[in-house]
Amino acid sequence: MAKYQPRDKYFQKARAQGLRSRAAFKLSEILQRYRLVTRGARVLDLGCAPGGWLKILSDAVGAQGRVVGIDLAACGSIAPNVIAIGGDLRDAAVAGAALERLGGSAALVTSDLAPKLTGIRARDEAAMAELLNISLAIAARILQPGGALIAKIFMSSEFKAIVANFERYFNHVEVTRTEASRPGSAELYIIARDFHSSRRSQDTTGGEVS
């Protein structure tokens, strides 16, 4: 496991730029590389606290766009075009409220979700797989045709199966690592593009998407 370095260069950059977390640079890098969102777009951010990704997304979509975040923890005020909803992603009513606040389908869904690790490999892998499945189910309900999903993933015994499931819903799926990820970290990101609207799901309860 990578040694935690609380004051690495990305920590310093985040503090200097007034960002809420160093994780903001991960999303910024991905958006610059893949061009997944445009001005005026609608975006949903899953697990949005403390708000680092919300700020990057707010800037990306501009004043005419809208960003909705969901998290159990409060995010506080980010920007006029950002709405943060408190709630559990497993609750279908929460996803429904997010769709209502968005005012229409989303061009992009983002997820930096990760479970609290127990050190028990099988349990941790199952918890991460559940979060990815929830993210995919919500995206399948909310994304517009051709939309995209960014989701954190760790290397595990479930890795290939998870990626294969994403490929059922998107024409283009790849896995990338960001420079802002800590050295030695197992953290990767799934970049899923060109959503098949015919695969739209009504299931946001964490059950397997089909």
Residue ranges with predicted function:
Residues 72-118:
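S-adenosyl-L-methionine
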Residues 156-210:
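Class I S-adenosyl-L-methionine
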Residues 63-64, 143-148:
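Short glycine-dipeptide loop
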Residues 129-145:
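A short glycine-rich, Lys/Arg-flanked "PGG" loop and its adjoining helix->strand segment in the class I
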Residues 50-62:
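Conserved SAM-binding loop of SAM-dependent methyltransferases across substrates and taxa
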Residues 39-49:
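Conserved class I S-adenosyl-L-methionine
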Residues 1-39:
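Class I SAM-dependent methyltransferase Rossmann-like catalytic core
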Residues 66-71:
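Conserved SAM-binding motif I beta-strand of class I
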